[in-house]
Amino acid sequence: MDFILNISMKMEVIFKTDLRSSSQVVFHAGSLYNWFSVEIINSGRIVTTAIKTLLSTVKYDIVKSAHIYAGQGYTEHQAQEEWNMILHVLFEEETESSASSESIHEKNDNETNECTSSFETLFEQEPSSEEPKDSKLYMLAQKTVQHIEQYGKAPDFNKVIRAHNFIQTIHGTPLKEEEKEVVRLMVIKLLKKK
């Protein structure tokens, strides 16, 4: 219980700080992953109301503040993409199509559980113990794990968040859905070995 309380307090500090910069949001998400990674992998599942609420808050903030950045060449669509990347890299969440900040705000209450559903599903499916048959996919998984481990530590967080491209493409060719799933399970298996 002390552990959960300690983590919740850390999260409050993270998300109550200035969220106006998308790069800061990326940093905060990276820090959150670093704090949770070992405990999540070892215990299998840690989901609290605080996580659900705070992640939903961050999601809305990214899209909402995009209007501020529009004048600097940072569009609302780019803000939504930033959030999709965060979910994809950190929580294996399916990316969603770009939506307006108004619709995000309207659906915010209904989507409280969405951000953490990935915490649960990530460990419900055990990766296969078989040796990887596709060395390209395995190398891709290893690259992804390397980026996840560096997340929150690298000086350029925007560059790190774009590590999702390692999951999306191989030599510029988009992965098939079944290939993405293979890589996802490989990543889980590699993380559990840490």
UniProtKB/Swiss-Prot annotation:
- What triggers its expression? Expressed in the early phase of the viral replicative cycle.
Q: Which UniProt keywords are given for this protein, alphabetically ordered? A: Early protein, Host cytoplasm, Host nucleus, Host-virus interaction, Phosphoprotein, Virion
The subcellular localization recorded is: Host cytoplasm; Host nucleus; Virion
PTM per Swiss-Prot/TrEMBL: Phosphorylated on serine residues in the 115 N-terminal amino acids.
Q: Where are the transmembrane segments?
A: none
Q: Which GO terms describe its cellular component?
A: host cell cytoplasm; host cell nucleus; virion component
Q: Does the keyword Iron-sulfur apply?
A: no
Query: Highest taxon of the source?
Result: Viruses
User: What is its biological role?
Assistant: Modifies the subcellular distribution of heterogeneous nuclear ribonucleoprotein K (HNRNPK) and may contribute to modulate HNRNPK functions related to processing and export of mRNAs during ASFV infection. Necessary for virus internalization.
Family membership noted in the UniProt record: Belongs to the asfivirus phosphoprotein p30 family.
Subunit comment: Oligomer. Interacts with host HNRNPK.
- Write down what this protein is called: Phosphoprotein p30
Q: Which organism is it from?
A: African swine fever virus (isolate Pig/Spain/E-75/1975)
Organism lineage string: Viruses, Varidnaviria, Bamfordvirae, Nucleocytoviricota, Pokkesviricetes
